[in-house]
Amino acid sequence: MSWLQKLLPPKINRPAGNSRKTVPEGLWSKCPSCESVLYRTDLESNSEVCPKCSYHNRISARTRLNFLLDAEGRSEIGMEVQPVDPLKFKDSKRYIDRLKTTQAEVGETDALIVMQGSIKAVGVVAAAFEFKFMGGSMGSVVGERFVRGVQAAIDNNTPFICVSASGGARMQEGMFSLMQMAKTSAALTRLSKAGLPYISVLTDPTMGGVSASFAMLGDVIIAEPQALIGFAGPRVIEQTVRETLPEGFQRSEFLLEHGAIDMIVDRREMRDKLATLMTSFMRVPAGAA
């Protein structure tokens, strides 16, 4: 052994072969807001809300309904209603092909899921948007499922809740899509005449034709923190009016300050808040909730 080898630290014995350990994909997640690296399981157990800065990540419609509804006694409404292509629409891709691709990628048939169930033993019909399905855009299927959900609430004398997350009307369906604004609003009029409450929950983002119709028609309008809510996006507005918009414009906190919504509720507290509101509206005995 040379004098140089004696000065160098001994080599670390490594087992033969490739011993490098790999970290499984999806084990960690980085918060888009505070950039904290979070253990995926911890994030899921915290309702997809960052435990460091309380940033609300976007979640799927089924995850949302799993958070809100009791585990027992659920049934899906309107799942047999499937999208079609009445206009034979084509942009860079045929609409019918875009639907098939999105259905395969997302695992849902359209952008709205409606379920009948309960929240803390209080009966309810709840709808939730799947934003990953073409930006949660509202087409004929979304409108029809929404209306069927409202009718189920009327038939069963329960409140109706809709959790919105949408970019607006689905351009590939043209006027068929825009007609859903009137169709859904008319259904909510029937719900109101039946003396039943409609609670609208706005999440990031709630825009376009959805915000211009049923999303803002709730007896109580709740928003998640920092949700983007409006008709046209802030960039489009700035380009149109040629002015710089105020800080926080179209965010939940801005809308609450200006009286456009009733309250902001953290996702982790949403189930309790909805149960309290429904108990009050329906005059359910306190022990039942």
Swiss-Prot record:
PROSITE patterns: COA_CT_NTER. A zinc finger (C4-type) spans 31-53. InterPro entries: AcCoA_carboxyl_beta, Acetyl_CoA_COase_Trfase_b_su, ClpP/crotonase-like_dom_sf, COA_CT_N, Znf-ACC. Its cofactor is Zn(2+). It catalyses: N(6)-carboxybiotinyl-L-lysyl-[protein] + acetyl-CoA = N(6)-biotinyl-L-lysyl-[protein] + malonyl-CoA. It holds the Pfam family Carboxyl_trans. The keyword Acetylation does not apply. One of its GO terms (biological process) is fatty acid biosynthetic process. GO terms for molecular function: acetyl-CoA carboxylase activity; ATP binding; carboxyl- or carbamoyltransferase activity; zinc ion binding. Its EC number is 2.1.3.15. Keywords: ATP-binding, Cytoplasm, Fatty acid biosynthesis, Fatty acid metabolism, Lipid biosynthesis, Lipid metabolism, Metal-binding, Nucleotide-binding, Transferase, Zinc, Zinc-finger. It is found in: Cytoplasm. Zn(2+) binds at C31, C34, C50, C53. The keyword Zinc-finger applies. It comes from the Bacteria. Its main location: cytoplasm. Residues 27-289 form the CoA carboxyltransferase N-terminal domain. SUPFAM superfamilies: ClpP/crotonase. One of its GO terms (cellular component) is acetate CoA-transferase complex. Pathway: Lipid metabolism; malonyl-CoA biosynthesis; malonyl-CoA from acetyl-CoA: step 1/1. Acetyl-CoA carboxylase is a heterohexamer composed of biotin carboxyl carrier protein (AccB), biotin carboxylase (AccC) and two subunits each of ACCase subunit alpha (AccA) and ACCase subunit beta (AccD). Belongs to the AccD/PCCB family. Component of the acetyl coenzyme A carboxylase (ACC) complex. Biotin carboxylase (BC) catalyzes the carboxylation of biotin on its carrier protein (BCCP) and then the CO(2) group is transferred by the transcarboxylase to acetyl-CoA to form malonyl-CoA. This is Acetyl-coenzyme A carboxylase carboxyl transferase subunit beta.
